[in-house]
Amino acid sequence: MHENFDKRLEVLLEGLALTRRSLDPEGKENELKELEQQAVQDGFWDDVARAGKISERIARLKQQLSEFNELKNKVSTIQFFLEDEESSKDLEMQKELEKEFVFCEKKITEWETLRLLSGELDRNSCFLSINAGAGGTESCDWVEMVLRMYMRWASSHSWRVEVIDRLDGEVAGIKHITLKLVGEYAYGYAKAESGVHRLVRISPFDSNAKRHTSFASVEVFPEIDDKIEVEIRPGDIRIDTYRSSGAGGQHVNVTDSAVRITHFPTGIVVSCQNERSQIQNREACMNMLRARIYQKLLQERLEKQNIDRKNKKEISWGSQIRNYVFQPYTLVKDVRTGYEVGNIQAMMDGELLDAFIKAYLVDYGEIT
């Protein structure tokens, strides 16, 4: 047991050193001090949008530094007790050390994933859309299951989730839903989920208990700020208004507050019914449209670069990326990386999604 702990400690110390270099806690401390000084200046809240972003950055810096210091202290504690021969032989102490090792190893893995997120927009919040494929009620039910997985996963990262647009299925489930994941590195993580997700199971809607295959497509695009210029000419868009169809209080189905914008040159369509007024929904739609057009331009640029990497791996936008098999056996397998797990319930609870994302980033991080 002691030898096993010693080897694991070596790995932890190496991981901690790499984390320190990539995180740069001293640099983060200096940035935090500068931002906190700005936050107490007169007129700070005159620009609410800017003040909000600075406040979020301050909170994120504090969280990162707190987590790093906690990790550093736990590794030091482990090292101290392993150097004490009497303590390291105690069975109760070994149980406590095992708990500390598991915590530190998980945290190191999280930091390792962050090191893979170096894209220009990886740090941004993002929009995530889920659409039902062919299969009627089956696919709508599958969309709702995928939504639950992402909601739980986002919660584990402490991201705020906003429902931008939603269309329920005629019998059950959801035909379409767009979320906004608000938090640092939301896009960096979520971009790995773009593509078609395939479900195989015995249908709860089939009285003959036959196996059915259902599909849900996921599209992820980053939120972009006003510094990034995206040209949208008035003549290139059509703006439609309609009555909201989802939950939203007294305004639902009372006024034509929901907004849909169609961009003719790209064929992109965005809609929003989450806000309480037509003006707010229109603004939200324009922000999404800018983000999707910019994402499309980035994809086209990547496709033209003809990047050689490993076995000349390619990304096919909108292609099938993952299979979820419930019957006759349980298996979740990513067709891009080959990574797979058998615990499908933990996967659908959002607990194993980060492992799939890390495998994707290791293989494709440099070209997305």
Swiss-Prot record:
One annotated GO molecular function: translation release factor activity, codon specific
Compartments where found: Cytoplasm
Principal subcellular localization: cytoplasm
Keyword Cytoplasm in annotation: yes
Residue numbers bearing the N5-methylglutamine modification: 250
Highest taxon in the source lineage: Bacteria
Annotated Gene Ontology cellular component terms: cytoplasm
A matching Pfam family: PCRF
InterPro entries cross-referenced by the UniProt entry: PCRF, Pep_chain_release_fac_I, Pep_chain_release_fac_I_sf, PrfB
Transferase listed as a keyword: no
Record's comment on post-translational modification: Methylated by PrmC. Methylation increases the termination efficiency of RF2.
Keywords, comma-separated and alphabetical: Cytoplasm, Methylation, Protein biosynthesis
Function of the molecule: Peptide chain release factor 2 directs the termination of translation in response to the peptide chain termination codons UGA and UAA.
Family as reported in the entry's similarity comment: Belongs to the prokaryotic/mitochondrial release factor family.
Name the record gives this protein: Peptide chain release factor 2
The species this protein was found in: Chlamydia trachomatis serovar L2b (strain UCH-1/proctitis)
Gene that encodes it: prfB
